[in-house]
Amino acid sequence: MPLNFPLRIRFFAHSLSGTHLSYNTSSSVPLLFRIFSSGLNHFEFGSRINFSTRPNRDQPEFERRIRDGGEIRASKSLIEDEEELSNWVSGFRTGSSRGILKSDDEDEEDRSRGRNQEKRGIRNQVDSFRNKRYGGDRERGFNSRIQGKSSEASFRGRKETSFSRDREDEKGLRKREDLRLEDESSDEDVKSLVMGDIGDLLSEDDEEEDQDYDFLKKKAVSAFGFDKENVIEADKTRNANDSYLTKTRFDHYPLSPLSLKAIKDAGYETMTVVQEATLPIILKGKDVLAKAKTGTGKTVAFLLPSIEVVVKSPPTSPDNKRPPILALVICPTRELANQAATEANTLLKYHPSIGVQVVIGGTRLGLEQKRMQTNPCQILVATPGRLKDHIENTPGFATRLKGVKVLVLDEADHLLDMGFRKDIERIISAVPKERQTFLFSATVPEEVRQICLVALRRDHEFVNCVHEGTIETHQQVRQMHMIASLDRHFSLLYTLLREHIMGNVDYKVIVFCTTAMVTKLVADLLGELNLNVREIHSRKPQSYRTRVSNEFRKSKGLILVTSDVSARGVDYPDVTLVLQVGLPKDREQYIHRLGRTGRKGKEGEGILLLAPWEEYFLSSLKDLPITKSPLPSIDPETVKKVQKALCHVEMRNKEAAYQAWLGYYNSQKMIGRDKDRLVELANEFSRSMGLDNPPAIPKLILGKMGLKNVPGLRAK
């Protein structure tokens, strides 16, 4: 039937002489939607018309057979397919009316900003259909067979911008930026303050466009059959009460005898569920995306086969001054990187010729360069920001990465949630396409599904060790929540800790706080109350964080007060209680925090302490076995003791905690949308610290948060 194009896209008609327009045909390629998605959505073509640049005959979609000497080359990913279209459509690209938010690559806790950046960045690109290819209902899963690796050319046009740092125009923020770059620490407080309520920046028009976009994405996914689930379920016969261990022994698989000997020395007798499910697939040479609960042996699951690849690789000539790095492990935080390297050294006990090196922020770049040059470095464990520094500044480092045979993204969801997507894409482009890639994570949100497009091969396997209908937390962990006004939180925290200590001789407690400076405040308070306390957060130097982390790992009778730098993957054995004070960022963060206890099948306890206006968060946990607990009685003497201890906490720490608290909750959409109410709650928090008047906040910061001239705030 004849079609009349709207005036705004009619100019394109002459270039479509070979284009076949199909009506209500789901098997054709919606090419114009990749180019004019916003325009066509505006004119309501999305649900009626599909476009194909194919001749008017039936052909398999996206099946490219390129003959070279009679052989069929390896199939390309959708990203590479669209790379070939880039020149053709370049003349028709127009800039989006929405800017792309950039996040600092080295910010380890810039989670909220990272998600918003990715959301806008994806909508801002012509290849948005590619990035959203796994769309649709998250519960429906996705087809892992259609994914592929991206070539270096896929990111050629983005290399110059992938690692460009944000420059703050205001002189008052430049000093903070320099300090953050020097320590590669996540300055969660300043970041959240500067970002403000970023969710409110989306207009109603943006939200309507998102709905149209999601509808188009789902139709495209359905048209190509990408919504059909292709998942390997790990031993579905096991119920939720089963141990995380299996009966399968490591020597059941063809592993190096020296590796098996090291495994035995480490006390590992049988495999965990995730190890049993992934090892045979990886040994076949396939890529893997694995979802498993925290504390179930994911680190060994990816390290052991990585070591096997290194063992089977031909030895490097001693004359080679730049020997290749064979296995590259990317971790989101320094603590996780150090932990993975320690585990690797344990497994390499009888492989003296194989070396593991760690490159993380907070240490001198020159020392790392020297260590990698003088010591064996077949396996490299790194955080994304520091790895980027070496790619840019270490001579010959990029050449060494050309030898990578195994790439591992540990805690993949956290890497992307922190805004490291650009770093990950750059790293993928720096290593060979012919490699094995493993993504291990406790959760698989949309961001992880998107990175699969560029990181994994089309024939990769999705191993799901968290079955549908089972809970995502360990059954042996007793979960409770308590609701109390802010003015009672400090007294309740002290009472809960004191009762737990009295009932557990070998107590080992982790207290999670919302921000680094609130963590500092709580640690100071508990120290004034004569509790045995240590603190870890992004404001502490790396040497201190490593020392405290090792001390807490080996000790008992200790309380660790921490921000979310300790929330993911860090293995602290025998933690008896995890106490979360205040609103977690989201459901996944609650699960990860809780996962610090109940590890390796041991029992544990988790308490979530919220204010009445934070109670809405519990609706996201309704499928978890968390129960409401009555508040313990607090005697007047305890209240006086806590108030006296608060008086001894330094005023500057209270001021910093107030500002950080305000910035954190300003970024929570349910709370930050009402600025007047937000300020009332912040001042309630100020009074809970024993302050009669709320601390003054710089006008620049208030402006960045969108809180200028809000009643109840003091500016300076």
UniProtKB/Swiss-Prot annotation:
The gene is RH31. This is DEAD-box ATP-dependent RNA helicase 31. GO terms for molecular function: ATP binding; ATP hydrolysis activity; RNA binding; RNA helicase activity. It catalyses: ATP + H2O = ADP + phosphate + H(+). A motif (DEAD box) lies at residues 410-413. Its EC number is 3.6.4.13. The Q motif is unique to and characteristic of the DEAD box family of RNA helicases and controls ATP binding and hydrolysis. Gene3D superfamilies: P-loop containing nucleotide triphosphate hydrolases. The keyword Nucleotide-binding applies. PANTHER family: RNA HELICASE. ATP binds at residues 292-299. Residues 110-121, 155-188 have a biased composition (Basic and acidic residues). Residues 279-462 form the Helicase ATP-binding domain. Pfam families: DEAD, Helicase_C. Residues 144-153 have a biased composition (Polar residues).
